[in-house]
């Protein structure tokens, strides 16, 4: 990792923070704000992490690195090769064609020979590792961060979690948050769809303790590989070897039968008793909301090893944009060829970071026949982690670049019709809070591949439309229309909820189809109608398509307000991840925050911003 830091420093991608900062909130808050700066800000190396304990200050001799993945330039420096070249190699690997001549035969042989790098190579443990075992183990000796005020404690956030099947034939590398309970116990937040969870059930059925090893640091590519959505049974270190074109070198663990990369900075080893679960959380997650307290497995730590000059790698997740934007971009680009094997007419896809990946995806396809887009929708919803996508919008090959925000939105709105909107139900991410049931909820697929027959509405200005609608729905506060020149303008309406569901009250507006097309209701107290970036983030987070959509002849009403019992939503509705103002003021006093108010207004760092009438 230190070689990578030298590279970051050389390219002006690293900021070193020598000011002592607390592992509780201060470090994470500063990294959170840095990641929201233009182009992802800098990677931050905190050289003096501290923890206040019983009126004393504990200092750590281990620096903390954050926002390491948080820019396109840092991704390029990490990969050492253009992402486009990696994508082409993946494409070639997945589509071997029969050779037409001797030269092509030689090329195929070379490509096959290059695959020798995918298998990890066993090596001895480095002799200079410092090792603590049994009673010497103390997780509090690591600068583990508490990232959010309402978190249940400190969490390891960039741990590479190594597991294997009961018969040792399958190995897995994943990345899950890990809550520190005490000096030798960690909570393992793996969800129902993770490979390690499948292994866990094998061990539980056999009534055998499950070995787990957690590595931190080393080559940062290990960490990204831990997040890669590979098919079940394919070991993520094989992907590492494919990208690096060299074998991952793995060393044996001391207290369990697993192996981890020998260059990692920190290794935590132990076993999980599959019959014991402990409450884990809450935790401010990548959705920008806190996930609730739930029972999860617990790792009993037997051994901790680390380098003399080890660096603790961490991240902070919450409201976008953050460094997971860039990690997700690499996933999106590299796995396009793999996704195309399931959907051959797929040209491109895009996961906007304010859709927090599983909440929104845009896809461009070669449309060949009627309902082709709906066929691809079902293909997406049946493939790996794509099955957790809540909202998918499909456009034709003549559509603009998917990342050209205004152009692609206008294209979609010209082609949208309620007849080509498919509302379905299926598995969803366990972190989704809007679904009525855990890990299962509504899905919305929109076929915007061809021109709509929906007539253009008769436009009113915002003030005239507001007066008209307030007469029929008194809890409307303000509204703003977006893309009024299109066939399907979007009217965002802020409301104050009282004693009835918004969808029920929206029926009072069905008589205004002449002026309305897509209508989205949001909470007045927590939404700035002039901030479309944060509006989209809240909207796709807060809806369940089966419950929260009402349609009429030409109108499409969406309730993106917070839900409760009046909406027949009986699960706890979470709070947003907001920075502590006390911590922010402390960071300001230390001279570490600049342009905070601008970023706060833009990305709702400390609280949600509502709109005043004079602002519209």
Curated annotation (Swiss-Prot):
InterPro entries: HBDC, UbiD, UbiD-like_C, UbiD-like_N, UbiD_Rift_dom. NCBIfam families: mena_SCO4490, UbiD family decarboxylase. Gene3D superfamilies: UbiD C-terminal domain-like (3.40.1670.10). GO terms for cellular component: cytosol. PANTHER family: 3-OCTAPRENYL-4-HYDROXYBENZOATE CARBOXY-LYASE-RELATED, FERULIC ACID DECARBOXYLASE 1. This is Uncharacterized protein jhp_0985. Belongs to the UbiD family. It comes from Helicobacter pylori (strain J99 / ATCC 700824) (Campylobacter pylori J99). GO terms for biological process: ubiquinone biosynthetic process. Pfam families: UbiD, UbiD_C, UbiD_N. One of its GO terms (molecular function) is 3-octaprenyl-4-hydroxybenzoate carboxy-lyase activity. Signal peptide: none annotated. SUPFAM superfamilies: FMN-binding split barrel, UbiD C-terminal domain-like.
């Amino acid at each position: 990792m230190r070689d990578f830091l030298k590279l970051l420093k050389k390219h002006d991608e690293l900021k070193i923070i020598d000011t002592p900062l607390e592992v509780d909130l201060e470090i994470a808050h500063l990294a959170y704000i840095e990641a929201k700066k233009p182009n992802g800000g800098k990677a931050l190396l905190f050289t003096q992490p501290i923890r206040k304990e019983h009126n004393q200050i504990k200092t750590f001799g281990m620096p903390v690195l954050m926002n390491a993945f948080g820019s396109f330039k840092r991704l390029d420096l990490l990969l050492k090769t253009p992402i486009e070249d990696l994508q082409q190699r993946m494409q070639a690997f997945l589509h071997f064609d029969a050779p037409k001549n001797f030269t092509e035969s030689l090329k195929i042989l070379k490509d096959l020979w290059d695959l020798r790098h995918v298998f990890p190579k066993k090596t001895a443990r480095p002799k200079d590792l410092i090792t603590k075992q049994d009673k010497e183990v103390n997780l509090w000796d690591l600068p583990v961060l508490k990232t959010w005020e309402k978190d249940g404690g400190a969490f390891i956030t960039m741990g590479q979690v190594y597991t294997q099947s009961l018969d040792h034939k399958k190995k897995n590398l994943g990345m899950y948050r890990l809550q520190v309970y005490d000096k030798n116990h960690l909570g393992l937040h793996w969800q129902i769809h993770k490979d390690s969870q499948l292994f866990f059930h094998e061990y539980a059925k056999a009534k055998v303790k499950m070995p787990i090893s957690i590595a931190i640091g080393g080559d940062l590519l290990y960490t990204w590989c831990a997040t890669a959505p590979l098919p079940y049974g394919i070991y993520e270190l094989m992907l590492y070897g494919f990208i690096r074109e060299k074998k991952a070198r793995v060393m044996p663990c001391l207290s369990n039968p697993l192996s981890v990369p020998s260059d990692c900075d920190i290794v935590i080893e132990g076993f999980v008793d599959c019959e014991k679960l402990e409450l884990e959380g809450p935790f401010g997650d990548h959705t920008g909301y806190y996930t609730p307290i739930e029972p999860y497995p617990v790792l009993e730590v037997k051994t901790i090893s680390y380098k003399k000059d080890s660096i603790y790698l961490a991240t902070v997740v919450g409201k976008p944009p953050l460094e997971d934007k860039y990690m997700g971009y690499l996933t999106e680009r590299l796995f396009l060829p793999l996704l195309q094997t399931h959907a051959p007419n797929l040209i491109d896809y895009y996961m906007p970071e304010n859709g927090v990946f599983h909440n929104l995806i845009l896809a461009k396809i070669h449309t060949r026949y009627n309902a082709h887009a709906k066929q691809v929708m079902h293909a997406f919803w049946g493939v790996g982690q794509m099955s957790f996508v809540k909202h998918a919008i499909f456009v034709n090959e003549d559509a603009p670049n998917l990342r050209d925000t205004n152009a692609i939105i206008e294209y979609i709105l010209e082609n949208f019709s309620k007849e080509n909107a498919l509302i379905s139900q299926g598995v969803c991410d366990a972190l989704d809070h809007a679904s009525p049931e855990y890990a299962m909820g509504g899905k919305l697929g929109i076929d915007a591949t061809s021109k709509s027959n929906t007539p253009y509405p008769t436009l009113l200005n915002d003030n005239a439309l507001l007066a008209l609608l307030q007469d029929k729905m008194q809890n409307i506060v303000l509204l703003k229309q977006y893309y009024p020149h299109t066939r399907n303008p979007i009217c965002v309406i802020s409301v104050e909820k009282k004693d009835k569901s918004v969808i029920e009250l929206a029926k009072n507006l069905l008589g205004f189809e002449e002026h309305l097309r897509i209508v989205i209701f949001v909470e007045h107290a927590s939404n700035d109608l002039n901030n479309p970036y944060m509006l989209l983030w809240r909207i796709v987070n807060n809806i369940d398509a089966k419950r929260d959509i009402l349609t009429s002849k030409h109108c499409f009403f969406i309730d993106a307000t917070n839900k409760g019992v009046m909406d027949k939503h009986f699960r706890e509705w979470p709070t947003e991840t907001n920075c502590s103002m006390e911590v922010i003021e402390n960071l300001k006093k230390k001279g570490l925050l600049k342009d905070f108010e601008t970023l706060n207004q833009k990305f709702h760092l400390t609280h949600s911003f509502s709109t005043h009438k004079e602002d519209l």
